[in-house]
């Protein structure tokens, strides 16, 4: 085991206690062999880099600042560790994901609450054009188009616990169209193919299943719930999900049939568009007509102020993607907080309405969102110190997970 920085130097700024340092060092020692490249052990650099990330002030993290905080390592050592060294970040990620899965399973054994795999995207504002996959695109962190990197994340959650277990960097189309730029950033040729965020989410889900990560259901926001390519694939794989949908999503309260209407009269062209024999409703219009006695008040989680309650309504509906010959049956879950200006959430599930109780569907719909907010807080604390290469980006994220 390579000598790590002394505890006195690490703890002098008061960020960590002696006990925390001992536990952190013991934890990272488990990954010792994964940082060995051609007989060179990078564990000291990994340890120092992790400490540098934790010690530097948010939004002021770069390799120069990290060297100031942990002077045992030089700038070029950090740069080489992230961008040049051939340690396998994927192998480290897989180890942490499996350890997280085992921990969440033990939490489930105690609480009885199901484990969710939450898919969500997050943006990280950047300056300049050199960072890998940076572009002017929508940045959720500030609610507008800005210069940023965007990534899709997978998190495991169970009741009060959540942790990030996977990520994939979104590469904009303008980057894919510029092979020279992709090659310069060391993006593998196999990855120089444009993927939408829902496609990236599906890849994360499948890779974690293949790895052996255990979960009971899949959650995500409206970007994923609205994407029928993703939901049809989850149906095909028989993976249970509860995904948010937008308020303008169209639903049928009865199973519709679809056909091209017969031509009426002799004038004009014949109809070519398929139409349903039932009326479709926007979800928010349906919500406005729910009677008071059609809501269930359920207890969902304990807070510092006591138990949190929400109103829940579930109903079987049909949703059509505009392409298939038939509509697919979904359970629509609507939750409403008990406030002067209530917050309303809509979700679709491929589970039958009889498969789960109203309270269980409320858990999937509401509790998971609270944990997503915690996960979002974790992601906003990630720092990206001027990384130009794709392996460096993933290596940086990997050290955050440790």
Enumerate the predicted regions with their spans.
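Short, catalytically relevant binding-site loops at active-site mouths
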Residues: 225, 248-250, 353-355, 383-385
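Short, well-ordered loop/turn and helix-capping segments at boundaries between secondary-structure elements
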Residues: 72, 353, 367, 371, ...
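Small-residue-rich helix-loop
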Residues: 398-402
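Intrinsically disordered or highly flexible coil/loop and linker segments, enriched in small
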Residues: 59, 63, 214, 370-375, ...
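Conserved, well-structured functional cores that handle cations and Mg-NTP chemistry
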Residues: 2-218, 225-250, 257-259, 264-281, ...
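Short, solvent-exposed helix-loop connector elements
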Residues: 356-365, 380-397
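An anionic, glycine-rich sequence signature occurring as long contiguous blocks
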Residues: 160-183, 251-366, 370
